[in-house]
């Protein structure tokens, strides 16, 4: 049984309970909203009520002997112990703490105020319980989506880190050293060996990785586009969130499609892919033996 206070609810206790749900810590637990001290004393966990913080089962921050900066949301986030793995969620929790403790007022359309908007007109009426449940459901869905995205980003970063990079004109004829799939051989050649163009190739069967994960590591990324059944070649931007890149793809005879801005091209499967790029005043053709 989880107990939190009745009356008006805020983002901190709503988020605290949602976090416990998303991390499967309170499956099917009964949630009671009350300030009745007898019920609070018999709770398995108290959140934002009760006047005690012990970091184990009691998570209130209103008592005068608590001098920390956390709200009940931050207390539960510390209890879960996963903050280092989820920086985006950690930032959101910090903002919830700031709002609830008065350290910083968030913007009108911030998550905190969206949660508060779920309160019923009569906070002690019959609709308030359902409104609280709706707010927790919304928070849980949002937090679950953030968790899924951060888990995915971690996986994609690991794939990018395990992808070998080859440079035009180097390692020709060497055994394949693509760490993701050492059963496939691939090599690259180019008209201008001194161009120093670096290529990352992700084999088929590996999840599509955004090129931003290769910033500062290479200039081109080639990977299989499962949806379109072809190879995708993309230029790597110089900075995250920008299109500007060292290279620009040009139309070549075996390309299915090359975007007019030159940041992506599609190429058929089988044999050799020849990619023509603009590199300053040079226009080398890079051939990738698939």
Describe each region flagged by the PLM.
Residues 104-205:
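Hydrophobic, aromatic-enriched interface-forming segments
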Residues 221-225:
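Flexible, glycine/charged-enriched surface loops at secondary-structure junctions
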